[in-house]
Structure formats: structure tokens, C-alpha cells
Amino acid sequence: GGGGGGYRGSSVQGQIEYSRTFGKHDVNALFVYHQKEKVDNQPANDEYKVLPYREQGLAGRFTYGYDSRYLMEFNFGYNGSENFISGRRFGFFPSIAGAWVVSGEPFWEGIRSKVNLLKIRASYGLSGNDYLADSSNNIVRFPYLTTVNMNKALYVWFSPNFVKQTGHEIKTVGNPLATWEESTKLNVGLELGLFDALTLNVDVYKENRTGIFMQRRSLPLTMGLSGVTPYGNLGEVENRGARV
């Protein structure tokens, strides 16, 4: 455990690693478990900041290579977030990647002095985000909970002298279906090396983000929630591009 920067906390981490080379085969595996908790020492009258931040997860990586020419990697994360209701807290996020070092092939020998590297690679993966934010970019904790203002002063119609009375008011509407924002990304790349002096990397990618946490535009007035519009995993964005 430790403190600093306004927080105190504790963490636990353990890992198991395996590595072996036999002949032209290289095999590596890694599994990591982590658990973390931190508490804000200065909650600033925010009832949510009084509560500890907790996260838990298991991650793994497996790599295989043959003769430094054919490469494969598989990763996964199984992560738990306190931000979501029981049954929706854990997400599984895998990815896979492969590469072919063409310049390592015997038929490349004749031009290796000019083109010393040609590597083709591709990857596809799913990632998740549990740090949700509202329209003002404030971090939202426990979006599945409805919050109530117990001391809202409101004018009461037909009351003596039309005075304000203290009552209850819904501040935020909880969404029990709130869960991880997800992103899938496909990447295809090429690495080219010339004369052992010049290197060129080219990547083409496509990314789809789904379940983006955002506010609904409107609700029926019959719900009695005028001015309080709930959030949900509603948004989608697609990005395409290239990097050199």
C-alpha cells in the first residue's frame, strides 16, 4: 500500500511466465493477475469519491515463432470493473496477430543486400473502456444507480404565499444496462528495410467503436423526468486510416 497525490491504496499482482526454444521453434506464455484499490484522501464533499476505486483482472499472452520467419501472438484480458452492475462487470477482450518475415525466406537471398527486410503483419483485437464520461467530460461512477437530491427547494403551487418547500428531486437516472464501451480494430502493415540504412513502416487500419456512453436526446414527458435525461451505451463510431 502507499499514499501520495491525494490517494492511498493497495495492489496485488502475480504472474506466471513460460519460455522455451526447441530447434527452430520459440514458445512464450505469460499470465498476469492484478487487483487494485485506491481511496481519495480528499473527497471534496463528493459522496462517490468517499468510496474506494476497485479493479480486478487477468491477462495473458502467448507467442509462437518458427525460424524467426513465421510469428503469431494471442493476447487476452478478462477485466472486472466496479462501475457496472453485477452480471455486467467483467469483459473479455482478446486479440490475435501474425507476421511473415518474407526477407527471411531462402528465395530472398539474391536481393537481401538491397532489401534487407520485408515483413508483412496483421492484427485484429477487441478492447474495452470502463472510464465513462458525461457530456461535460466528467468521469461517471456507478451509472446504473439513480441519485436523488433530498433537499431540493421548489415552489409549491397553491401553497400559502407561494413559498418554496423542501422536497426530493431525481438528479440522475440510473441505467442497469450500462456496460463496457468496446472497440474492434483491424490493422494490416508492412515493414520495409533498404540497404540496411532506410526503414519504412506502412499501416492501414479500420476501427469500430460501439457502446459509446452518451446521453439520450429526449424522454417522454409522461415519465416525469423533464430535464433529467439518462445515459446509455448508445454511440457508434467508425475510423479508417493509414500511417506511414
Model-identified regions with their sequence ranges:
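Extracellular/periplasmic, surface-exposed regions of secreted and cell-surface proteins
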Residues: 1-244
